[in-house]
Design a protein with these regions (language model features):
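Sec-dependent bacterial lipoprotein signal peptides
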Residues: 1-17
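A structural "domain/chain start" motif
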Residues: 5, 17-72, 190-196
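C-terminal/domain-edge helix-coil "capping" segments
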Residues: 17-35, 128-196
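Solvent-exposed loop/turn segments at secondary-structure junctions
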Residues: 50-51, 92-95, 159-160
């Protein structure tokens, strides 16, 4: 009976040892010379020129940016007929944090005395799971005048979260980053803020 109680208890203890990481979103924005043109009219959303096109979940970020722009007062349209264009760039990397120490440790001890001597050996096994992978994401958005190509606004966001959090999906990460990027739009030019 005791064995059946201890097994779930041990599993709970191990589950509690799993580390989670969720950073705030670091946001920097730059406002161009014509801020009155921002937040209104038709705008198209597309990948930035030269942006890596291999990100499988790029569409989630593009959709999150489009939704954020619509909330600001833009009318998001397809094609090249819009007066402004939002160019989106995304880079995601996965890293596995290193363990603080090895999973197995060995200790040796010895003793001598008037009644003899003795040697002891100890073996320790770390049963905690390895730390989860951490996804680091960088997203940049540049709003340009379609005709001239002039930059009206630029924003950059950085965010990290371990794969065992709700932000493991690209969609959740994209919405969190877009919400932070457009928070208090257009923002103070050159200022970096952190959004939780």
């Amino acid at each position: 009976m005791t064995r059946f109680i201890l097994a779930p208890l041990a599993a709970l203890m191990l589950a509690g040892c799993t580390q989670t990481i969720v950073s705030p979103v670091s946001v920097t924005r730059f406002v161009g010379a014509q801020p009155a043109r921002l937040g209104q009219g038709p705008i198209a959303v597309r990948p930035a020129p030269g942006a890596p096109g291999t990100l499988a979940d790029f569409e989630a970020f593009q959709d999150a940016v489009a939704a954020g722009l619509a909330r600001l007062g833009y009318r998001v349209v397809a094609g090249d007929s819009a007066a402004q264009v939002a160019e989106v760039r995304v880079l995601r990397t996965l890293e596995r944090p290193a363990r603080g120490r090895g999973p197995v440790s060995v200790g040796v001890g010895g003793e001598t005395g008037s009644y003899g001597s003795g040697v002891g050996l100890g073996l320790g096994i770390d049963l905690t799971p390895p730390p989860p992978e951490v996804a680091s994401t960088q997203m940049g958005v540049v709003i340009r005048d379609t005709a001239s190509g002039q930059s009206l606004w630029e924003g950059r966001a950085e965010f990290s979260a371990s794969r065992n959090t709700p932000y493991a999906s690209a969609q959740a990460t994209a919405h969190k980053m877009a919400d932070a990027l457009f928070s208090g739009f257009p923002g103070r030019s050159g200022e970096t803020i952190e959004v939780k």
